[in-house]
């Protein structure tokens, strides 16, 4: 009996010691870096072959920066120009990386780039920071309903690169082992065209989709959700709440620093966790943070409804920890700017593009400023056009509802309120004071 108790005690002690050894020493990890950077590369080269770039990174023991840029999109074009030009802020840092530039989502190799949980696909510029073995250090990118410059800046990218370099060249990094597993490179590259939803998505795409040579990033988001849509399990209210903002947990971060807390809303998840203005976020969800996109990624992969997210932060050099307690509805953001949502494969569009009436037109047709005032751009052959909608019709209500929404806001409002197979009735004015109704069925395909 005594020997059994001794054995049990030793076993428990060993288990405790193993658990303690297995837990990352976050105080050391986020503390002062012990890194010595090598001489920068003589020239910044934006490579297009990811596998060759990885081999080059291994040979030189340099981290990789992989940028994905959807060239047709104007969104983030100014930021992309800043990155490509480099300048005195970015060039000295870019020259420390093996840089890769991909301009077609077909070129994404899913073995390296885990787009499903680590890339906001409605954004036309995104960055991945990888180790020479392909382990994921950090991500960079971001946008909101305000603009494409409220979440990212060249200064924010520079700070993130400095943090990644300090982490990569820290002699203790391999011992920490916090960067996740290296990718399995066996087999052929896995393009976005190998995703389960690709064939169904492509077959239902219009002539423009079938004609295009590349795949846009927002279309990858549509492809990813296609199987759930086909299975009838996709919830257009729950499953569209993607990439929450720091403000969703009550935290406002400095854009150019990425992790510095500017303010915390009273009684929010952030405030209740103990976070204050002036703190610097350091760790969340068991991942080290290098910038705002990393934190948003943790939120994105976090609870759908009620739950907790572990978080750590630095205050005057001292590491502190707490939990973000989130409740139902915490993920909600403004969605209509998202191309994959307002004009993607969720439901069906109205069959016209909803342009805004001018102030003079509203006055002429006696339409209140807070009511619907949509001037339709006519799509030839659409169900709305076939039902009699014309370009001179001013739309003032849909099924009796008259919110003041236009453009993509109208598109998402329509898709979120009405389902394929349902009847919709447009109330229109053909001339001032002359009202009629146009009814049609929303197509199922």
Where are these regions (language model features)?
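Sequence context surrounding c-type heme c attachment/ligation sites in exported
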Residues: 91, 99, 119, 150-249
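PDZ-domain C-terminal substructure recognizer with occasional recognition of PDZ-binding tails
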Residues: 282, 297-337, 390, 396, ...
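Thioredoxin-like thiol-disulfide oxidoreductase module
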Residues: 52-54, 87-136
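PDZ/PDZ-like domain segments forming the peptide/carboxylate-binding groove
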Residues: 242-283, 287-290, 352-397, 401-404
